[in-house]
Regions:
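Residues in the short beta-alpha loop(s) of Rossmann-like NAD(P)-binding domains
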Residues: 36, 126, 226
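Strand-loop microenvironment adjacent to phosphate/nucleotide-handling motifs in alpha/beta enzyme folds
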Residues: 143-313
Length: 313
């Protein structure tokens, strides 16, 4: 029996991926793995539980390797979407951001290896490229861990996608802007020159599924995306007001580093990035004493500085 496990499956991306999978084959096994009971219940109303063949819902912690392994039973594909994504939340709670985004990814990778999952894809972000924020740091380190997992599995092909912002996601700035527009309030913009990559939720889900099908072991895939001036988009909702930075951010995001350009190949509508080997991912995979490294926010901050320096040097 084949099936797909989606971590963070009750989130906006996970739900759209599930919709597309169900539309293609309503009888395939899809395991929605997340820790949000409310979101799972809401999703059940749209996509009912279908028994052995169909959607199944499992509550679980992303750091629980045993629970993940149980969830992967009868699955042959894994899509790892689960993450803490709010930049300000990650800055305020460095420990939890690292636990979920980094250690959670390590747990998923280990469960995939243990379960002999043939294909597994990680959903990364442009903020992992030359990171400046805690969120970017955790996603960048998770990328390294995921890709380096190929060194420790003969049966699983680990690959990743890396892209910008999704317009219709539940945590998109556009939801906040629409609320402010309805209230007649100014539209906050951090910097007049800031740009961001955007595309639709449907395109994001479709890209992940296609790369899961045809992607190659150890490759990071980035779509050809358009960058937009945020100030211009804000004008569609009301009067923009410049607020300044609340958290570490960049004026312009990029989908690969200058150094990665030498290892990046155009595939038409997307790019294949052959990542240079970094020590971080393999260090974690072979059993780094994570409890000592990530035992406090101070330790994590020191580690984050070393990681960012190593990726931007």
């Amino acid at each position: 029996m084949s099936g797909t496990l989606i971590t963070g499956g009750a989130g906006s991306l996970g739900r759209e991926i599930t919709r597309q999978l169900v539309a293609k084959n309503p009888h395939q096994r899809i395991v929605i793995y997340s820790r949000d009971e409310g979101k799972q219940q809401a999703m059940r109303e749209e996509i009912p539980e279908g028994g052995p063949d169909g959607a199944r819902y499992m509550l679980g912690d992303i750091c629980d390797t045993d629970r993940l392994t149980a969830a992967m039973k009868y699955c042959d594909r894994v899509i790892h979407c689960a993450a803490l994504k709010m930049i300000d939340t990650c800055e305020y709670d460095v420990y939890e951001a690292t636990r979920i985004n980094v250690m959670g990814t390590l747990s998923v990778a280990k469960a995939c290896t243990r379960s002999h999952i043939p294909r597994a894809i990680y959903v990364s972000t442009d903020k992992a490229v030359d990171p400046v924020s805690t969120y970017g740091f955790t996603k960048g380190l998770a990328e390294d861990i995921w890709i380096h997992s190929n060194l420790h599995s003969d049966t699983c092909s680990f690959m990743a996608t890396r892209y910008g912002n999704v317009i219709s996601s539940t945590k998109s700035v556009f939801h906040q802007w629409e609320k402010l527009r309805m209230e007649g309030k100014p539209i906050p913009v951090t910097h007049p020159d800031v740009t961001r990559y955007y595309w639709t939720l449907s395109n994001a889900a479709n890209f992940v599924l296609k790369r899961l099908e045809d992607g190659s072991r150890g490759i990071i895939y980035a779509p050809s995306m358009r960058s937009y001036l945020i100030h211009d988009i804000a004008k569609l909702y009301g009067t923009p007001t410049i607020t300044g930075w609340r958290c570490p951010e960049k004026i312009h995001e990029i989908l690969w580093t200058d150094h990665e350009t030498s290892y990046t190949t155009s595939m038409g509508h997307y790019y294949a990035i052959y990542p240079e080997s970094h020590p971080w991912g393999d260090t974690f995979m072979v059993g780094m004493p994570v409890t000592s490294t990530c035992s406090s926010a101070d330790h994590i901050s020191d580690f984050k500085k070393d990681f960012i320096d190593g990726h931007t040097a």
